[in-house]
Amino acid sequence: GGYASNDTIRYYNHRSKAAGLLITEFHYVSESGGPAYMPGYPSQMGIYSDVHLEGAKKLAQALKKDGNKAVMQIHHGGRMAIGRFINHQDVVAPSDLQRKFPVRALTESEIEEIIADFGRATKRAIEAGFDGVEIHGANHYLLQQFFSVLTNHRTDKWGGSLENRMRFPLAVVREVKRVVAEAGAQNFIIGYRLSPEEIHGTDIGYTYKESLQLVEAIVKEELDYIHLSLWGGYDSKPEGADQSFGSLFKAALDDETKLIIVGDIFSEEAARDAVENYTDIIAVGRGTLVDPEFGHKIMTGKGDTIVHEVTPEHVPNMHLTPGLFEAFTRTDSLGLPPLPGAETIYDQHRGTYDNHPLAIPYAEQ
């Protein structure tokens, strides 16, 4: 599994003008790392074997055809890789967990092998023609699982203290850097994506103050950027804080490490406000699902023509993959933030994946 489908290549081919730096969806670096949890993800892309190189090369070519930079996002799903449970395979995490399915703790040797897998995935990204990799340490995937006390109950060097919980993410960062240096890949971009806090009611995996310490440690490794995954909007703040997440984390970076934030950017006005007041660089996710030429329109002085909302008439211009279309025409968007105007296309939902074992809303994972 893990191959780039024709639908996926077409989807990215239509988004080569979405931005100047194009970051792919996640690729799992180990066979145990995926697929993850929603429709379309049974065909989630992998980069754990050389057999994935052909598709990765096509993907890089599609993204770069208009002169933009292409970055491959690499991750391990950990407990979120429920496709393995469906396929009667082990689901792994830092510690034994009982979710909707059993999750077993990784052994020491498996941890070391996954670290090496991130390096091998980076080497394949270089060979495929990508300009960089983004290490995905957000959204409850394995790197975040090691950092969170909710999913890391280990008592060895990989768990317990904050320093020990940072050990796995930092080991991955160093392995990726080592491989890039060994390959002699000049100007190869390395970024790190993280969720700035993990708080679910009274359950606290970590606070933004702890993740600031992780970021400070990552900055010492001289990465190119930190990418904050924000569900509350680009201007959101931690509860009880006076400053936005963007302002707090930007202050923790040096001049060489840039901050990227994402969240609720659907117009040129919002994009400019974010860059002027909260961050160095913006990432646009759902905005480019609605309008695949989001960035190009701003750069060519046509920002006022950006399409902000979904309509039935506009659907063909979005060029979504079948999985994305099915997810965003569900009334619950599978727990993901909905597309603006999505209620106008709920009647186009086909139900293709509704009974698929992986069609479990994000919040239930």
Language model: regions and residue ranges:
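Flavin-dependent oxidoreductase catalytic cores
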Residues: G1-Q365
